[in-house]
Amino acid sequence: MSYAIFKHGGKQYKVVEGDIVLLDKMNKEPKALVELVEVLAVSKEGKLSFGKPFVNGAKIEAEVINEGRGKKVITFKKRRRKDSKTKRGFRRDFTRVRITKIVA
């Protein structure tokens, strides 16, 4: 089984062909093709190769499925006896992609 580890938006993802991954928003239309070139490691036919920092000539081809927003996460801070509190919400914008091909 071949897999790859790539970096996108400050995070690292381990994927195989056919996986569906939520990435940071990329402003792409559905069915658009995306190339992810910051590949840190690739395993093909049992042979593992690491990059310094990226693997030369390696890329991951993916197809955009859709874009959306995640569930709301609420942060709440309260300081006792001061009637001081803060409530803040955050929703992550994401792009859902399907990994179609790992090129090494």
Swiss-Prot record:
Q: What does the similarity note say?
A: Belongs to the bacterial ribosomal protein bL21 family.
Could you describe the subunit structure of this protein? Part of the 50S ribosomal subunit. Contacts protein L20.
Query: What are the protein's UniProt keywords?
Result: Ribonucleoprotein, Ribosomal protein, RNA-binding, rRNA-binding
**GO CC: one term?**
ribonucleoprotein complex
Q: Which NCBIfam families match?
A: L21 (TIGR00061)
Official protein name in the record? Large ribosomal subunit protein bL21
Keyword rRNA-binding in annotation:
yes
Q: Which gene encodes it?
A: rplU
Biological process (GO) annotations? Answer: translation
Spell out the coiled coil positions from the record.
none
Its biological purpose is as follows:
This protein binds to 23S rRNA in the presence of protein L20.
Q: Which PROSITE patterns match?
A: RIBOSOMAL_L21
GO MF annotation terms: rRNA binding; structural constituent of ribosome
- Pfam families attached to this UniProt entry: Ribosomal_L21p (PF00829)
